[in-house]
Amino acid sequence: MLKSSRETKYEIENLGDVIHPVCCGLDIHKTWIYAAILIYNFEKKQIHWITTRVTSFKKKLDKLSKWLIVNGCKYICMESTGQYWIPVFDALEDAGLKPIVAHPKYLKVLSGKKSDPNDARWIAKAFACGRVVASFIPPKAIRNLRSLVRFMIKISHEATSNKNRARNCLTSLGLKLDDVFSDVFGKSSRSIINYIIAHPGEKFDVAPFVDKACKPPFAMIQDSIDKAIDAKQDAGTLLKLRKALERLDDAEKDIQELKGNITQQMGAYKKQLDLIRTVPGFDTDPFTAMRVLIEIGPDMKVFPTMKHFCSWAGVCPHHDSSAYKVKGRRISRSGTYLKPLLVNIAKAVVRSKNHPEISQRFNRIKNRRGYMKAIIAVCRMFLTAIWNILSKGEPYRADGFMPVNNGNNKAISISQALAYVRSRGYAIIDDNSGALTTTGSQGT
């Protein structure tokens, strides 16, 4: 069992409306974790502190969980400090406690009172009074899938970087394979590149390496290779090209392995995936719906309304105003992994004529606010649809969005029309007399 601080500390303070009279604040570091349990006495307006310090090893985290249970503390609040909070959160969750992770901006300590024990006490005070906004932490199974997907995205970025390095090497060697092949990293092109790397400066017949389904004629490919082959090819560039291609092959192999593992684990969420695939743009690639579900989680009850959901994803303007002055309306930086995916889907869907409810809204906003703001508005349409279909368990319906007023039922009086024309700088001339009109009746 952990040892608490040698002297328990009491404070006389009226915390006002206390939501959690018994809670704990954790100040997490790489090696040490400072814990402070707050016990509030409503009658005496008194705070009783019980503090301790533990290391971040697994056995010590289990002892920390038992220490919290012995002291009757069920709710624990901590900052989202890098990756350090993850093992602490997992250990407390496995022990049946209710840990809460919050953004550091909600837990800033007053200047001049900064220390690790004071940080833990401040976190406990803020959480007890309900001043902490909890971050969305999905279930453990989704968290594990999320880490795999994000790791796969990092590897795909590395694969793209290695493709660019390989293209630069081919350009330096004078091999203009992109002029004759649509895909430089296709089967035929890679076979030719591998032979050039293995036999530098040697001229050869490309016919055995080119697939029969390849569109460019053999003569054209042969001519392109013969012009580029040179006995004085730089050995360093060839080595760099070979290493870039090896890294590319390893990355693509890892991506396929991760995709297979993720797809297998996502079998438990088939119902939610089928619903998400009914949304326009999410039915082309099955892995797209998986990525979205892994980021948002299968349960929409954690978001009270679709507005909260869209705000969490970072596809709505933030509010920043003071003294009747609006300082900014830009979208937040939330949704680092979800937002780029939605933007790519939106750019493809708005070009389609199969979904007028989306393309009409996009064109209407684009004319007023610009292209990217209209794309973000379409992303919000996607999230609104996903929140509703997952909450209600119903597939996507195009008539779920408000119909667009096409302007056919607009009406204006003659006097209003004449006043509008005059406001635009036009002089109204009578058709019969040719004289300028001065009243609405003369213009008719």
Give a label for each model feature.
Residues 1-444:
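A detector of single, family-specific signature residues
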